C-alpha cells in the first residue's frame, strides 16, 4: 500500500495503478487455475502472498489485516485524488496517462457532488483547472449539506 501512495505522491500514476492492480485480490483468481493457486478469498485483501517454492502465489492472513482500509485510501485519496479535510474537498488525481478520465458521484449529507475528471494533457497528475457549476475556482471546494447538486469538472 505504501508503494502505491508513494508513487502517487511522486506523480507516477502508471506505476501507482500497476501496483494497485497487483494487490487486487481478484487479479489473483481470474481463472480456476490461478484461484486454486491463490487458495484464499478473492474478495479480501491478503496480508501475504507467498513467493517461495511450492507456495508461490498463495495468499495468507486474509481477515487479520488492516490493509483493506489502506487499499481504499490509496485508491480514493491518492490515485483518484479525492480528499476531504475539515469539510473541504480537493481533487488531485494521479492516474495512468492512457486514462481518458473518470467520474465520481459523492454525497455529503443531502448534497450531491458530480465530479468529472478529464485527462486532457495525458499526464499522470497536476490538476490544472477546477470548475464548479461553470465557474473556475481554486481546488478547495467547501462541502455543504443543503441538498444542492454541484457539478465539478477537473482537468489534468
What feature does the model see in each segment?
Residues 2-156:
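Non-catalytic C-terminal accessory modules of carbohydrate-active enzymes
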Amino acid at each position: 500500500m505504501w508503494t502505491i501512495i508513494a508513487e502517487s505522491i511522486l506523480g507516477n500514476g502508471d506505476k501507482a495503478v500497476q501496483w494497485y492492480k497487483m494487490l487486487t485480490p481478484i487479479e489473483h483468481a481470474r481463472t480456476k487455475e490461478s484461484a486454486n493457486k491463490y487458495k484464499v478469498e478473492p474478495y479480501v485483501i491478503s496480508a501475504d502472498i507467498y513467493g517461495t517454492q511450492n507456495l508461490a502465489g498463495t495468499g495468507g492472513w486474509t481477515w487479520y489485516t488492516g490493509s483493506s482500509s489502506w487499499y481504499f485510501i490509496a485508491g480514493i485519496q491518492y490515485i483518484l485524488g479525492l480528499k476531504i479535510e475539515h469539510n473541504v474537498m480537493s481533487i488531485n488525481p494521479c492516474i495512468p496517462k492512457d486514462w481518458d478520465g473518470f467520474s465520481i458521484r459523492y454525497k455529503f449529507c443531502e448534497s450531491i457532488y458530480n465530479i468529472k475528471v478529464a485527462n486532457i494533457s495525458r499526464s499522470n497528475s497536476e490538476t490544472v483547472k477546477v470548475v464548479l457549476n461553470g465557474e473556475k475556482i481554486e481546488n478547495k471546494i467547501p462541502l455543504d449539506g443543503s441538498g444542492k447538486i454541484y457539478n465539478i469538472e477537473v482537468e489534468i
